[in-house]
Curated annotation (Swiss-Prot):
This is DNA mismatch repair protein MutS. GO terms for cellular component: cytosol. Keywords: ATP-binding, DNA damage, DNA repair, DNA-binding, Nucleotide-binding. ATP binds at G618, P619, N620, M621, G622, G623, K624, S625. The lineage of its organism: Bacteria, Pseudomonadati, Pseudomonadota, Gammaproteobacteria, Alteromonadales.
Amino acid sequence: MTVIDTSDLEKHTPMMRQYLGLKAAHPDMLLFYRMGDFYELFYDDAKRASEMLGISLTARGKSGGDPIPMAGIPYHAVEGYLAKLVNIGQSVAICEQIGDPATSKGPVERQVVRIVTPGTLTDEALLQEKQDNLLAALYQGKTGFGYATLDISSGRFVVAELPTREALEAELQRTNPAELLYSEDFTDMLLINNMKGIRRRPEWEFDYDTCINLLLNQFGTKDLHGFGITDARLALQAAGCLMQYVKDTQKMALPHINSIVRFNQSESIILDAATRRNLELTQNLSGGRENTLAWVLDNTATPMGSRMLQRWIHEPLRNRQTIQYRHSAVSELIEQDLYQTLHEQLKSLGDIERIMARLALRSARPRDFSRLKQALTLLPEIQQTLAICQQPRLNTLVQLLGEFPEQHDLLERAIVDNPPMLIRDGGVIRTGYNNELDEWRKLSEGASDYLVELEAREKQQTGINTLKVGYNRVHGYYIEVSRLQSDRVPLSYQRRQTLKGTERYITPELKEYEEKVLSSQGKALALEKQLWEQLFDLLLPKLQELQQFATAAAELDILSNFAERAELFNYQCPQMSHDIGINIEAGRHPVVERVSQAAFIANPVALTPQRQMLIVTGPNMGGKSTYMRQVALITLMAHIGCFVPADHAQIGEIDRIFTRIGASDDLASGRSTFMVEMTETANILHNATANSLVLMDEIGRGTSTYDGLALAWSAAEYLAKNVSALTLFATHYFELTQLPELLPSVINVHLDAIEHDDTIAFMHSVQEGAASKSYGLQVAALAGVPASVIKAAKHKLHQLENRDMTLSQQNPTQVSMNLLPPIPEPSLALEKLAQINPDELTPKQALDYLYELKRLSHTNT
């Protein structure tokens, strides 16, 4: 790192003194320092930018006696470079020239006018249109964690109180923030170190009273009771820090952030981090979007609909009424044949949600207002399309769309049909909107007629037939004459520029007209900018209603999308039951059936309190994992309001979905594959309930055969006896197929395969009963394992089977059972003993406990 001597600023040049002062105020950010047509970076900023952006590192003379490392980028290309930087979690402070170079005696006055951080983006060019861009803050307390997220591009502000590390990990994965703020005393850095855009914040920013005042000021309320979050102390501390950061970086009012919502885990099906990862909901195991549930379900018409759909996928509902409202809305859109018309209308809306954020931040561009005008034009058509609907949710959404005739009329009168990108270019305000602007424009636009007239007049008076009148931005207006005829120009012509074959002149008349035209152009542009700012003032009073319009349109987009997916992919409306159980007829995996070249084999599943665990056996590649995942995905799809890939589905009450699927280590945490597997298994055994859906795949394969078998048997038995969760338990330990003989609620099913000689055909069909064998050697042969190895494996297999046969003859019915006896009942006496702290007991209390332990020991015998 370059050490910059700032103790004596007089050593540095005036420009570098200015730079160092601005850099000191933004030490953790790259400072883009405007120099003419470039943004320049110096010292360590230059070195880092050179590495991150692949730009040249040079030097700019010396200051304070030392060379100045420098890198630069053209100002007109800045958005592309900013996109690269924020994508890797880097923040940037943009410093512009705000003074007039003509009147500045020293360095031109400069000021940081914009701060760009990964979590506070609103610029369309920097955002991914189909993904929420969240700023998050995290605070650790004695009772758990406070967590807050803000999407500044929509104003969505959500807080949560999370009791455990596992809950926090799941929430971090669900929200996937672009930038995360955490306090100085946060201890579990292992959890967040691999995340992009993490920012350490001083402890005082999490001060409770300071945070409350910040939130009250933002919402303009006397207290927070109306938001239902007053008891969420840790969450409020996180929210307050987040709010402080946004105010510091945005440097303006934030009227679109007008409410705060508490995320309540009890209102949605809980999915832990492993489950979200294993089910590949919105991100596949490689980090991409292809072949995920969202990839299949998302044919939404608008970016805001796509983002809302991803939130729905990660927050499957438990509220039966809301789920059924969504299902019935989708049904009506199909029955009335409205979904295609609605989809086409919504496609023209654009991203109203993010346009509203830019309106609130006064950073909207002319084309944003043009899109808003188009959206408001379409609004009556959308409402007319849905006018025949009877379904309550659709009727509510039509009302929430609202009516904006005055705002539509304003934009229609004010904005031209195809405006330029930036207001600084002018030509945004429509002719007829403002009389004064029309007058200034008329004066400046009349220049072409005047120049034609002047050229004809001067040609006639001078007799110079090559004479031309023209204009360029550098030299202004001029009269051009070929060099051969330049000796014929009048004395009133003053030479302005000499070119290779021509001379250019100015006359007093042309100079006077130039000043008049340029003045009118400047005044027209200044007035146009003033009228542009007034449009914000006229639209902002309707901001909340316009945000509501965007939210309602996004939900309509999802519902019409669900209808389209159902018709295209032959999905059926699931029946939601209040009973415990899952009954699916001819279910299909929504992703695999779309990417598979062969016809997908549909399979049933029946899980009830009397049939609560299926032991799933069958060959490798037979489809066990696909079968289990499809049950979870169908269940989840039903709970977001989507139709499902099945002939019929009845889905009961579900509180959580757990998965223990796949094998991977966690090198960053120093955890082996087996340790990861056991950690996930422990989480399931501790937290699953009778209303949970549990998928367990190949438990115990990461250790020795007997250890693995013992763990798999015990985990399955515990889930069946102690938890009673609805469970799919896939295994290659055939000993587990004897569990149904001990536990009547456990059932064997298998994925069918047909063996012919040394080949195998996978039928992918689920049948009742246990599989006869695992076909591991046949699968190995298909994978290309050398024939000599397969031959040796067959020989070894026969040896092992003969040994097992000998063992079983000693006790043919009970050998496997005796190896794995049922789990003993927990000892009440030992549990009580574990709760006692002997250092805190009086003699009398110790004697009382001794009698109690004696009594409990008899209870267990």
